[in-house]
């Protein structure tokens, strides 16, 4: 499988899984994907995730989606910085998603974190995606 945007693929799997009301989805594992899922879990957008060994050298992420009263917790999730057009943001220019109701996930020199954590740490970085 040759993917030019692995993170975009995982976000699409999450979006499609929520639309289909699936409780669990899978995605190939990587450090970046795991770090993004950790932020989503910490912010309460997914129930959890774990890494499964499919065979030696191949690992998958098992992502448990979250619903509130039958409706998906994630209303919107989309990629901002793409392989063909990277989007970087200074601390002063960090985006506010729906006036603070959603989050932006950033890749910073201190690791992957939400926009609120980046403001608290006073760091900018690449805006990976927005979640609402």
UniProtKB/Swiss-Prot annotation:
HAMAP family this protein is in?
Answer: Ribosomal_uS8_B (MF_01302_B)
Q: Which InterPro entries match?
A: Ribosomal_uS8 (IPR000630), Ribosomal_uS8_CS (IPR047863), Ribosomal_uS8_sf (IPR035987)
| Keyword Ribonucleoprotein among UniProt keywords | yes
Chain's gene name: rpsH
- What exactly does this protein do? One of the primary rRNA binding proteins, it binds directly to 16S rRNA central domain where it helps coordinate assembly of the platform of the 30S subunit.
For this UniProt entry, the molecular function terms from Gene Ontology, in alphabetical order, are:
rRNA binding; structural constituent of ribosome
Superkingdom field: Bacteria
Say if the entry is tagged with keyword rRNA-binding.
Answer: yes
Instruction: Give the UniProt entry's GO cellular component terms.
Output: ribonucleoprotein complex; ribosome
Q: What is the lineage of its organism?
A: Bacteria, Pseudomonadati, Pseudomonadota, Alphaproteobacteria, Rhodospirillales
Q: Which keywords are on file for this protein?
A: Ribonucleoprotein, Ribosomal protein, RNA-binding, rRNA-binding
Biological process terms from the Gene Ontology for this record are: translation
* PROSITE patterns in UniProt: RIBOSOMAL_S8 (PS00053)
Q: What is this protein called?
A: Small ribosomal subunit protein uS8
Q: Which cysteines are joined by disulfide bonds?
A: none
Q: Which Pfam families match?
A: Ribosomal_S8
Quote the subunit structure annotation.
Answer: Part of the 30S ribosomal subunit. Contacts proteins S5 and S12.
Q: Which family does it belong to?
A: Belongs to the universal ribosomal protein uS8 family.
